[in-house]
From Swiss-Prot:
Record region (Complementarity-determining-2): 54-60
Disulfide bonds: C23-C92
Region annotated Framework-3, chain positions: 61-92
Region (Framework-2): 39-53
Other facts noted in the record for this chain: The PC 2880 and PC 1229 sequences are identical.
The protein, known as: Ig kappa chain V-III region PC 2880/PC 1229
Annotated region (Complementarity-determining-3), positions in chain: 93-101
GO biological process terms held by the UniProt record: adaptive immune response; immune response
InterPro entries per record: Ig-like_dom, Ig-like_dom_sf, Ig-like_fold, Ig_sub, Ig_V-set, IgV_Light_Chain
Key word Disulfide bond present: yes
Length: 111
């Protein structure tokens, strides 16, 4: 299975500043010229919401302050400017190989 290592495990960012979350895969998640890396946001009591798919594409209705980048094994999610509503857990997920696997999560809070 592809192992995803997320960092940091927790992060506190001031309103209006930038939050950066990293995800490293144990092997490349690229195939057919596509990076099969996705990012999800989850709030307590709610299902995960897709923010970014294929490394850098925004999900439907996702604000422009969420952006993703990377290829191969190294990826990042950026949130800028940080808003109060962005407090949540964030997860990377690879969809290159079954079983699809998730990172351990990053808890994002307001500083």
């Amino acid at each position: 299975d592809i192992v995803l290592t997320q960092s940091p495990a927790s992060l506190a960012v001031s309103l209006g500043q930038r939050a950066t979350i990293s995800c490293r895969a144990s092997e490349s998640v690229d195939n057919y010229g596509i990076s099969f890396m996705n990012w999800f946001q989850q709030k307590p009591g709610q299902p995960p919401k897709l923010l970014i798919y294929a490394a850098s594409n925004q999900g439907s209705g996702v604000p422009a302050r969420f952006s993703g980048s990377g290829s191969g094994t190294d990826f990042s999610l950026n949130i800028h400017p940080m808003e109060e509503d962005d407090t949540a857990m964030y997860f990377c997920q690879q969809s290159k190989e079954v079983p699809w696997t998730f990172g351990g999560g990053t808890k994002l809070e307001i500083k």
